[in-house]
């Protein structure tokens, strides 16, 4: 699948405003903007494994398409939701455990980049990754 491989963060668009809307304090936002995030994504059928390493943490997330699971963001925000394939996009629909508000995420390959788009409370941000 096109998502398979090692990806390294290249740049962000509107990420600070997005994090602010999420309620992340200014110090954590400044650090997160330079988190040196790397993702290693592998897919076997409907099962995905995402190894995430950054300045903040190293974790492995395993999920199956369409199956609800729990996930914690780097700042500790707890989410529940699932990922699905919609055409060539990996679409995540999550809900914050603390306030019930939706956080939607889309991963798609555009050219030689993986673009991860987040939408929360009407604020959209993008994190753009290059193959490592």
Curated annotation (Swiss-Prot):
Cellular compartments per GO CC: cytosol; nucleus
Superkingdom assignment: Eukaryota
Major place of residence: cytoplasm
Stored Pfam families: Lipocalin (PF00061)
GO biological process: fatty acid transport; intestinal lipid absorption
Any one GO MF annotation of this record: long-chain fatty acid binding
Binding site for hexadecanoate: 83, 107
InterPro entries found in the cross-reference section: Calycin (IPR012674), FABP2 (IPR031272), Fatty_acid-bd (IPR000463), ILBP (IPR031259), Lipocln_cytosolic_FA-bd_dom (IPR000566)
Compartmental location: Cytoplasm
General function of this protein: FABPs are thought to play a role in the intracellular transport of long-chain fatty acids and their acyl-CoA esters. FABP2 is probably involved in triglyceride-rich lipoprotein synthesis. Binds saturated long-chain fatty acids with a high affinity, but binds with a lower affinity to unsaturated long-chain fatty acids. FABP2 may also help maintain energy homeostasis by functioning as a lipid sensor.
Written domain comment of the UniProt record: Forms a beta-barrel structure that accommodates the hydrophobic ligand in its interior.
Name the UniProt record assigns to this protein: Fatty acid-binding protein, intestinal
Species, as recorded: Sus scrofa (Pig)
């Amino acid at each position: 699948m096109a998502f398979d491989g090692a990806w390294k963060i290249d740049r962000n668009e509107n990420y600070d405003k997005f994090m602010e809307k999420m309620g992340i304090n200014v110090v954590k936002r400044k650090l997160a903007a330079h988190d040196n995030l790397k993702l290693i994504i592998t897919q076997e059928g409907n099962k995905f494994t995402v190894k995430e390493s950054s300045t903040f943490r190293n974790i492995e997330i395993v999920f199956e398409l369409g199956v609800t699971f729990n996930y914690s963001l780097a700042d500790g925000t707890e989410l529940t939701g699932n990922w699905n394939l919609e055409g060539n996009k990996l679409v995540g629909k999550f809900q914050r455990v603390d306030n019930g508000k939706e956080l939607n995420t889309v991963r798609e390959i555009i050219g030689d980049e993986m673009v991860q788009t987040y939408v929360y409370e009407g604020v959209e941000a993008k994190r753009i990754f290059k193959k490592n």
